[in-house]
Amino acid sequence: MSKTSVIYPGTFDPITNGHVDLVTRASRMFDEVVVAIAIGHHKNPLFSLEERVALAQSSLGHLSNVEFVGFDGLLVNFFKEQKATAVLRGLRAVSDFEYEFQLANMNRQLDPHFEAVFLTPSEQYSFISSTLIREIARLKGDVTKFVPQAVVEAFERKHQQGW
């Protein structure tokens, strides 16, 4: 039987406990999980690619079958390069499903071998998004129950730098 691998793409700006939950669960379902951290030029990320990779590694590095890779360009091309089995996407709400369904179908048009696997987050993470976390942190709110400790510390450093 061949090894199964799944790509979990995102900007992870920052990684949240919801992301950690999905990767942890995927690591039990697939032989290999590739956390593919998009450069995200169009999103103007708060954290650099290097910072986001380091935060993901510190949050998930204890999982031996998880690797962390920065990438740029079309996901479907990265999928082919990695020879992945599938792409993992999290679904928090019906609105996520509509967008992800459209995206998966477009990617399948570009590559008929493209497969998407959808997981819903554990209930306590269903409302968390990186966008909300950044906004709470920007306004100096407490995000400790939503993100790994390394992210809390990274936000503290951003505040010390005048963010």
UniProtKB/Swiss-Prot annotation:
EC number: 2.7.7.3
Cofactor names: Mg(2+)
UniProt-annotated binding residues for ATP: T11, F12, H19, G90, L91, R92, E100, Y125, S126, F127, I128, S129, S130, T131
Enzyme class: transferase
Site (Transition state stabilizer): H19
Family per similarity comment: Belongs to the bacterial CoaD family.
Protein name (database record): Phosphopantetheine adenylyltransferase
Taxonomic lineage: Bacteria, Pseudomonadati, Pseudomonadota, Gammaproteobacteria, Moraxellales
Gene: coaD
